[in-house]
Each structure stands twice: as C-alpha cells, then as structure tokens.
C-alpha cells in the first residue's frame, strides 16, 4: 500500500501506510536480575525449536553510522540512537541453515523508574524501513516516550537488513491498465518482465519473503531484547504485520496500535482493489478545493470542470506519451502512468498536499496541450523514483505481497474486472484492478494468515482513508471483539497518529500507550479546521 508523505516515511514510515495489551505493563525495573529472569523465560519459550541461538543472542549495540557518507546514521548517533544487527534464519523450517540479518535501532528509555518496555515500529509498505524512526516517534509520544525503549527495525530484505535485489529499473510496479486493450497488454508484459527479473536475481530467497517470516523475526527481536512481551506501532501494511504477530505469538504482545488498518481478507496481491470509491471520492473533494482556486491553478472553476481536466490529461496520454520537464530531467508519461500519479499525488486532504498536487496537475495539463513544462524539484524526484529509480529495494514490496497470498494467473480475470470498474471509477478502477506482478511469481509456501484469536488492540482509522479503507478497519475491528476503534471523522487521510496533527487522536493514543488501558468503548475524534 502506498505510503502517504515524506514525513510519514521519516516519522513512523508510501505507501503512503497502530497496538495492544492483554496484560499489565512490563515490570519497570531494569536490573540485572530482571533481565536474567526475562532471558531465561525467553530461552524456555524457544526451547526445542532449534531457534535457541537466535532468541538467546544479545544485540551488539553501537554507532548507527556506516561510514563518513552515512548522513542518516550520523543523525541517529546525534539523537542518541544505537544500532545493531539481529541474526535470523532465512528459512525457519531449517534454523541451522543459511542466516540473514535484520537491522534494528534503539532509543533507550530515559525514565527508567517508570519504564514500560520496548515498542517496535513498522511504517508500512510493505517494505518500509523503520531504523530511522525512533527519534520522531519519541517526539510523537510526548511524555510517554521516555518510558519506552523505542525500537526501529528494517524488515528482512529491506533497508539496512540483508538486501533483496530484484534488478528492477523502476521504483514501483503500481500502474494503471490504461484506456485500451493494447495498454493493458503492455502492462502484462511489463509485470511479467519484472517478475522474471526478480526470479533471476533473487529466486533462492523469494520463498522466504513473507509477512509470517517477518513476524517470526519480530519475535526473535523480542527475545534478543530480553522482553517477555513487546508493544507495537504499525501503520498501513504494518497493521497487517501486527495482526499476524498476534495470531502467531499470542501472549507475547502488550500494547498494540494499528493505524490505517487493513483486514487480512483485504490484504494481498490486489490490495488496492476495493478502494476505488474512496480514492475517487478523495479526487472529487480535491477537485472542489482546486475549483475554488481556479485563478491560481487554472484547472477549472467547478468541481466537474476540474475532473474533466483530469480526464483530458489521461486521454491525451493515451494518444501519445506526455513530455514533462526539460533536458536531463525529461519524462515521458503514458496512460498507464498518469492515473497512478493522480492517486499517489492526492494522498491526503491537508492544504499543503492539495496545493502540491494541484501544481503537479497544472504541469500535466500543460503537457497535454503540447506546451513546455518545468518540474519542481519535488515532482522531478517523485517521477524519477517511481518511473526510473530502480534500487535494490524496488521489488521488495511486491516480493512480500506475492509471498503472502496467491494471485489470479489468467490476465483475462484482471481485464474483466478492469472493464467492469471503468464506468463507475474511470481513473481508479484500472489502477486498482490492474494485473499484479504476483501473477507471474510462484505460489506462496504458506497459507495466508487467518484471524482465529481475539486480541486487545487500538485500531485507528479515518473515515475517508483512500488507501486502507475505513470499511476494512471496521472489518478488522469486528474480527477482534476485544479491540477498540478510534475513528477520525471527516478526514481523507491515510495514517493519523503523530502525522496528521489531530490532537484528539494523538492524545488518546498516547494515553493508551501510557496506561495500557483501552477505552471502555469505541471513540470518535473530529477533523480539526485547516
């Protein structure tokens, strides 16, 4: 799922994409005796599984900087963060076989007298790193932050962990199916090509890329930290990871916050399918905003006129790629790429995001008329990242999703869904229903996780979330009767706590993290005026 903002990426996690307690808080003392007792309990929990050496390891905490050019590492060092690698098996069915490392970071509790325990972070994606996140999360937690060891980790094959390189020449495989059958056929070839590259470069590890294995890694991290239980803050996809952990390791979790949550049934290779209505509604709301600023952006003086502008841009890109930028910063955008930009750019309803998106659409509108355009540094960087910015991590998101659930294999299945979706959702339908890269990768080794155990947790959701829909958060809440739902009414936003600036949401989450007590009933906050 798409994370939403650059701030999201640094603070708690595109992906645009939080946590639960079943028992009172962990003992606050950090004495040697307490640590030894916890380590002994951890060792017993892993006894006989062949995993003892992983659970019994102790991180070698040290500097986060990996060299003179590691700016992020230096910033973490300055913030008092320590970093380490945790050893985990590549294949949990063969714990004596090949090993990989998972990078972790720690901002230690400073209020040791009232220490609660360790809280792990996941920023969504899937494939989002979190080693960089503890300083920002400490600020978000306000007075509660100093009571936790805040633990960031880069999931297996992400960021500073043992990498997985799919050899992709692009930053993401998310595209629209376009306006024609020919465009769709190009997408079929594009996705098959990406799958073939990933299999050729990383085929030996692909069977071990999955959320269930990441959850197993989380439990090893818990053991390595010497904790009986862990707390957790997970955004977007991180909510799915958190849910999976509670199902696989009951009794090992404390305070879990799942923000921008998704029900397990809605997660998988077609994870945007079902969000068409919310994304089109978000576009419509933005169009009404832009219409009031026609003098600034020139996109139309009514909501309908602005939406017509979007349709004309897509139609023009179908006739021939739009040229945006100049010189070395020139990009060609066709009808499979432009709709994706409409969805990715309209990530929330803050004035800053709406203005930035309006500026981007203005550029595309000029290009659709054949006029020269100039890109802002931010838009140019976003285009480069998505369209040409291949990196070792580019294929990790797809690899994880494909390792979690099987996808339909027949391209006709997707084409029929695309055609059915066009009338009601002309922009989002062909994006949400487009063929998945997973259609060309092997079937996952394990069955998808089912919610069979109740779990106490706080689920946070906005009614207009365009990524993981409010309906999906409600479904997860219903599957976990002991959970409580914190709703933000009136917001078109994915991921809220500490990121959206809603005091009501932030204070209620922090109260839960501080006390370990869920509210007696579901609670509702209201969007603050801009």
Q: What kind of feature is each model-predicted range?
A:
Residues 163, 169-224:
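Active-site-proximal cap/loop segments of hydrolase catalytic domains
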Residues 227-236:
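Alpha/beta-hydrolase fold nucleophile elbow
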Residues 2-15, 27-181, 304-307, 437-443, ...:
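Catalytic-loop region of hydrolases
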Residues 492-503:
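Catalytic histidine-centered segment of alpha/beta-hydrolase-like enzymes
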Residues 459-464:
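Conserved strand-to-loop "acid loop" that flanks and positions the catalytic carboxylate
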Residues 49-54, 308-455, 498-500:
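Alpha/beta-hydrolase fold active-site neighborhood
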Residues 466-471:
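Conserved alpha/beta-hydrolase "acid-adjacent" motif
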């Amino acid at each position: 799922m798409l994370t939403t903002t650059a701030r999201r990426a640094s603070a708690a996690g595109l992906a645009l994409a939080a946590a639960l307690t079943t028992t009172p808080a962990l003992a606050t003392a950090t004495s040697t005796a307490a640590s030894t007792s916890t380590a002994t309990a951890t060792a017993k929990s892993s006894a006989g599984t062949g995993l003892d050496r992983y659970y019994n390891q102790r991180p070698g905490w040290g500097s986060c900087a990996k060299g003179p050019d590691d700016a992020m590492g230096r910033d973490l060092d300055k913030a008092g963060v320590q970093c380490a690698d945790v050893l985990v098996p590549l294949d949990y069915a063969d714990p004596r076989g090949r090993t990989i490392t998972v990078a972790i970071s720690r901002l230690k509790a400073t209020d040791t007298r009232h220490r609660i325990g360790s809280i792990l972070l996941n920023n969504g994606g899937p494939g989002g790193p979190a080693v960089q996140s503890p300083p920002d999360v400490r600020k978000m937690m306000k007075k509660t932050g100093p009571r936790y060891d805040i633990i960031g980790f880069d999931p297996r094959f992400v960021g500073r962990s043992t990498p997985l390189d799919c050899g992709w020449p692009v930053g993401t495989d998310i595209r629209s199916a376009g306006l024609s059958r020919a465009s769709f056929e190009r997408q079929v070839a594009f996705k098959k090509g990406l799958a073939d590259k990933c299999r050729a470069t990383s085929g030996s590890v692909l069977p071990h890329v999955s959320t269930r294995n990441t959850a197993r890694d989380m439990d090893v991290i818990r053991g390595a930290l010497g904790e009986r239980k862990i707390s957790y803050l997970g955004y977007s996809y991180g909510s799915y990871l958190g849910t999976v952990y509670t199902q696989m390791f009951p009794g090992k979790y404390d305070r879990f916050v799942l923000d921008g949550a998704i029900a397990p049934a809605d997660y998988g290779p077609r994870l945007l399918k079902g969000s068409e209505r919310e994304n089109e509604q978000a576009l419509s709301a933005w169009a009404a905003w832009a219409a009031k600023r026609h003098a600034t952006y020139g996109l139309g003086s009514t909501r309908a006129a602005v939406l017509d502008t979007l349709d004309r841009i897509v139609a023009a890109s179908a006739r021939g790629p739009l040229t945006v930028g100049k010189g070395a910063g020139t990009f060609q955008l066709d009808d499979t790429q432009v709709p994706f930009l409409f969805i990715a750019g309209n990530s929330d309803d803050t004035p800053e995001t709406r203005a930035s998106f309006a500026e981007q659409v203005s550029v595309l509108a000029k290009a659709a008329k054949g006029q020269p355009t100039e890109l802002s540094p931010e838009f140019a960087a976003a285009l480069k990242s998505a369209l040409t910015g291949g990196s070792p991590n580019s294929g990790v998101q797809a690899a994880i999703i494909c390792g979690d659930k099987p996808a339909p294999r027949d391209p006709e299945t997707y084409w029929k869904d695309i055609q059915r979706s066009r009338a009601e959702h002309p922009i989002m339908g062909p994006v949400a229903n487009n063929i998945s890269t997973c259609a060309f990768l092997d079937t996952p080794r394990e069955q998808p996780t089912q919610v069979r155990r109740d779990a106490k947790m706080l689920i946070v959701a906005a009614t207009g979330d365009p990524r993981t829909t409010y309906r999906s958060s409600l479904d997860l809440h219903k599957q976990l009767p002991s959970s409580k739902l914190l709703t933000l009414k009136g917001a078109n936003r994915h991921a809220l706590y500490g990121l959206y600036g809603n005091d009501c949401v932030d204070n209620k989450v922090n109260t839960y993290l501080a006390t370990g007590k869920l509210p007696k009933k579901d609670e509702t906050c209201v969007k603050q005026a801009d």
